[in-house]
Amino acid sequence: MHKLTSKLSNLILLLLIIIIFISLILTNFNNYLLENLSEYEIKINNTEISREEFIQRYNLECFYNDKNFKNDIITNPKNPKYISEIYNITLSNIIYESLLQQYVHQLHFNIDYSHVKNYIYKQTIFRQNQKFNKEKYYEYLKKLQISSNEYIKKVMTYLEIKEFIKTLTNTDFILNNEKNNILKLFEQGRIVNKSYVNLNNLKLIEHISNKELKRYYINHKHQFLSPKKFKISYFLINKNNVFVPCIKKFYFKNKDNTFQHELFLQHKKSKKQNDNIIKKLLTTHTNTSQFKNIIQKNNICIHHTPWLTQTLYKHEKLPKKLLKYIINNNILFHNNKNTIKNYPTIIHMNNNNAYVLWIQKYEKATIENFSKKIRKKIINILKNEHSKKIRYQIVQKIVYQLNHGDTNLFSQLKLKFSNSEYYSRFNTNTLTNKIFSLPIPKKGQKIYFIFHDQKKLFLYQFSNIFYFKLTKKQKKMIASYISQSHSEIILNAILENLYKTAHISYKGYIN
């Protein structure tokens, strides 16, 4: 079942995409068309989604991803993982949009035709000299391969759903009394004191038997893998870097030394030649012999990385984000992640460049032998685990004693609480969540608890509460958050119910 979390914000974005991208659509949409897409049809209750409409929506989603993420995310329209993700997003959006559209039609959110006309007239893509231009309007509809009536219907649907969302978000579903109680909770602060528990001098286990070390090694062999490592060969493809190198040697001499300097005089090929080379490379990269011939024939410069692993990847000539993407997604390997591809992989960057990469050398991950180095590593692991366990048990005992009025162990370890620290619900961290999850202590009592912070162990004392006045801006922000939260809960409930009661059938598939 599709996830429904944060559906309100996602849905509003989805609804905007429906029309905004129809208006902004460009001629290069065809670059994203799926290959090998057989007859595809989705039926949601009585709404049928044709194969053509699915492709169009897929294209819009690709366009949105490229425009929104720019160079932050590497997208490859031929990458199976990328195709799968975009396909699932498109399918989910189509289903929820159709269900909501059917629901809104049942509610009779009628939009006057004048609003539709006004909306279309205001779209900048259809305007010329600050006026609506009919020629531009029909020109863009032609690019979309959509009729004016179809476009008007889509605008009508968009405005109906937008009106429904507006009505939902503007309706106050929460009682004033409930709202005031929530505001009072936000006006409450809590006072705590902390003590750093330093038990570094604690006596640890001194001897661990060889039998215990071997048992740990056998049960945790995955911890002692020497990582798979590989060297990558690559080159960059763009229309400016395919050269014919004319190499000449230049000798420079002086009275003390003789220097030999090699000059690479690189002459660009014509645009037509470059385009032809790139086209051949992109279409023959899975044919290793043809691919190598093109590289050799055109003297394309190949670069090589040093040994790389899953955790150690650095090469000054490759963007770090690209290397991270390559390694984390195992794109140079087959699906089993241990067999390398015997042909190059092409990664399309968002700046119209492409990197062509393949693995030059590869060594599989192997389990290290039970050597002295591994024994030492296991000893440190077991000592550290034992240390943590003992320390935590001691702090638990301190907390138990303090909560029962006994300060004996606390004093023995010479622990002290710091000055008071003040927390409100506006602090956003795990410690704040912990503090506000505790009950308010009775008069004269204190509540003690343990908290880990960056491998350090702290003992906290919750002693009192205080109140402060919220500003008008803060009250407005909280009220808005409460209202949005309630609207989201209601919309999620509506969508979940619509999904559960819907008849959804699929016909066809995507390769």
Swiss-Prot record:
Residues 30-511 are extracellular. It comes from the Bacteria. Interacts with the Sec translocon. Binds to the lateral gate of SecY. Forms a complex with YfgM. Keywords: Cell membrane, Chaperone, Membrane, Transmembrane, Transmembrane helix. It holds the Pfam family SurA_N_3. This is Putative chaperone PpiD. SUPFAM superfamilies: Triger factor/SurA peptide-binding domain-like. Residues 227-281 form the PpiC domain. GO terms for molecular function: peptidyl-prolyl cis-trans isomerase activity. It is found in: Cell membrane. The chain crosses the membrane at residues 9-29. It comes from Buchnera aphidicola subsp. Baizongia pistaciae (strain Bp).
